[in-house]
Amino acid sequence: MRIILSDFISLDGVVQAPGGKDEDRDGGFQHGGWSMPLFDPEAMGAVVGEVMDRTDALLFGRRTWDVMAAAWPERAGDPYADQMNSIRKYVVSRTLSPEEASSRWNNTALLGGDGDAIEAIRALRRSGGNGGLQVWGSASLARQLVEHDLVDEYCLMLEPILLGGGKTIFPSDRRARPLELVSVKQAKTGVLICTYHPVRRSANA
């Protein structure tokens, strides 16, 4: 599978709590819901739909999955919600049980219960075909995937706002990771919707 990392991201690299005031207050974060005034349904909604159309499964960290699992099942009947509820989902957690995961949100499977989530994701990426495995939010998990060079595509909605600190998806390991810009679109709200692919270096480079 191809791992697609999708995130709303501020100009200073913050991805924390874009959707709601109380979504994630870790570290005293006070700007929850910061991306909502900048959301352009026409441009950004179209990109979200396009990426979902080539996504075979979703991958979440525990916190983001908790937020999603509490919201989407209640929206059944809406075409997009029905797609979200029926698609295969994976959640990385050491504390959830497989039974709890599947009962709280339909078609959810547990990864990393044995403590090695990255290896489980690496195996899934190797064996899951050519479809997309899309990661939403999940800053800590996303950062680990970037760190281990497991991301095949970045779909970043770069928003014209500075948040002054918060969770990021970028490692601080001082490694350079070149990216190729595949496409960029501008929303009416000033958001730049950027798609990047990693530039894979050969072993002899």
Residue ranges of predicted features:
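Portal/gating segments that form or line small-molecule/metal binding sites
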Residues: 1-150, 160-205
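Periplasmic plug
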Residues: 153
